[in-house]
């Protein structure tokens, strides 16, 4: 069953004002252009510029820094958004994710495929066949891969709509995490679905993809 508890440390809640655009637009980067454990924070900053937000937290005592980039458009009803995040430990990339609700590159996925994934049996190759290409990948130490030797594939999607004559924004976010051991066999799966409704307000810090650990 999907969990509906708050995510750690941030839940995506896109808050806009009027017809403003928030952030500079960007396209989906090619995952092959990143190498986990090797790509540096300096390279990401040079490539994408100043992030919308930046946070730091500890995973098993190890400091992980996350850079987040966001772009949104305020429309009549739907409020499409793109976000991407990059996590680093000691200056090297340990994870990245991309989320979009724009029609051109939306990252919707079928969470029902989770029912066919078996812990201790399903391989990463089989999981990719069932769910498709992930929006993000993480290695230890990160919020999705919290033990040495583990890696995780992440699937993220968010949809926002204006309610109450445009005075309220309702956002529904889905994040599926599939963690693998050193043999690329599934050890954990975690599906989180959250819905939030907030007054429209320009708050860039809330436009960040969620980073929740496995439970």
Regions found by a protein language model. Give the residues of each.
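Residues within mature, well-folded domains
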Residues: 22-215
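Short amphipathic alpha-helical segments with coiled-coil-like heptad repeat character
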Residues: 1-2, 136
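Bacterial N-terminal signal peptides that target proteins for export
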Residues: 2-11
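Bacterial N-terminal signal peptides
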Residues: 10-19
């Amino acid at each position: 069953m999907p969990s509906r508890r708050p995510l750690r440390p941030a839940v995506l809640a896109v808050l806009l004002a009027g017809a403003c655009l928030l952030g500079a637009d960007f396209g989906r980067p090619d995952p092959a252009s990143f190498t986990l454990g090797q790509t540096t924070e300096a390279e990401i900053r040079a490539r994408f510029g100043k992030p919308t937000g930046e946070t730091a937290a500890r995973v098993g005592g190890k400091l992980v820094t996350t850079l987040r980039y966001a772009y949104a458009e305020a429309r009549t009803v739907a409020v499409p958004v793109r976000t991407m995040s990059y996590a680093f430990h000691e200056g090297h990339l340990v994870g990245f994710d991309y989320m979009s609700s724009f029609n051109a590159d939306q990252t919707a996925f079928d969470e029902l495929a989770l029912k066919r994934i078996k812990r201790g049996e399903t391989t990463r190759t089989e999981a990719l066949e069932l769910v498709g290409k992930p929006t993000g990948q993480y290695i230890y130490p990160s919020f999705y891969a919290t033990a040495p030797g583990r890696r995780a594939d992440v699937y993220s999607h968010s949809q926002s709509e204006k309610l109450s004559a445009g005075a309220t924004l309702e956002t529904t976010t889905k994040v599926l995490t599939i963690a693998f051991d050193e043999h690329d066999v599934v050890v954990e799966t975690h599906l989180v679905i959250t819905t939030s409704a907030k007054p429209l307000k320009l708050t860039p810090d809330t436009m960040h993809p969620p980073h929740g650990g496995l439970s």
